Swiss-Prot record:
Keywords: Cytoplasm, Elongation factor, Protein biosynthesis
Similarity remark: Belongs to the elongation factor P family.
Function: Involved in peptide bond synthesis. Stimulates efficient translation and peptide-bond synthesis on native or reconstituted 70S ribosomes in vitro. Probably functions indirectly by altering the affinity of the ribosome for aminoacyl-tRNA, thus increasing their reactivity as acceptors for peptidyl transferase.
The protein's name in its UniProt record: Elongation factor P
Main location per the UniProt record: cytoplasm
Compartments where found: Cytoplasm
Gene Ontology BP term (one): peptide biosynthetic process
Source species of the chain: Shewanella sp. (strain ANA-3)
NCBIfam families: efp, PRK00529.1
UniProt keyword annotation of RNA-binding present: no
CDD domains given in the database record: S1_EF-P_repeat_1, S1_EF-P_repeat_2
GO CC, alphabetical: cytoplasm
Gene3D superfamilies linked: 2.30.30.30, Nucleic acid-binding proteins
Keyword Protein biosynthesis: yes
Amino acid sequence: MKTAHEVRPGNVIMFEGSPWVVQKTETTRSGRNAAIVKLKLKNLLLNSGTETTFKGEDKIDDIILDRLDCTYSYFADPMYVFMDAEYNQYDVEAENLGDAAAYIVDGMEETCQVTFYEGKAISVEMPTTIVREVIYTEPSARGDTSGKVMKPATITGGGTISVADFVKVGDKIEIDTRTGEFKKRV
């Protein structure tokens, strides 16, 4: 048990009978009144979000989830299958991957963290940076060099991100998976 003051982003709490990951906390104090803690939460089972408030001294059940390093194996509609170092396979529903699904490709070498709740794989966390190939983008516009010019590009895995104007089809680029932003050409 933690008080609402002690909860930090990244903690997993039990709220309304489900596990929720804390994405953001905001504490406000007003004159004589006790502190109010506002939490932005994401439900790990339903992949939905909400915001809620607690009094600073309210007790909150924190839970510790199991996490395991795994590699992507294959897609069996509607499940993504991941394998650990001991060749155990874990199914994760496609809807639970969220934005990570755009970065998953056959034969990927990056290791992902699979999160478990009560023995069931419920989510996948990608590495913070990955390298993917650009499979489609428009050619650069000649003479358009005023400032930071970005254009849309489709990467292996099917995701679309904004890349710098100098990036061409076939280039390998580094992507920040937390924000979905282009970092550099590799």
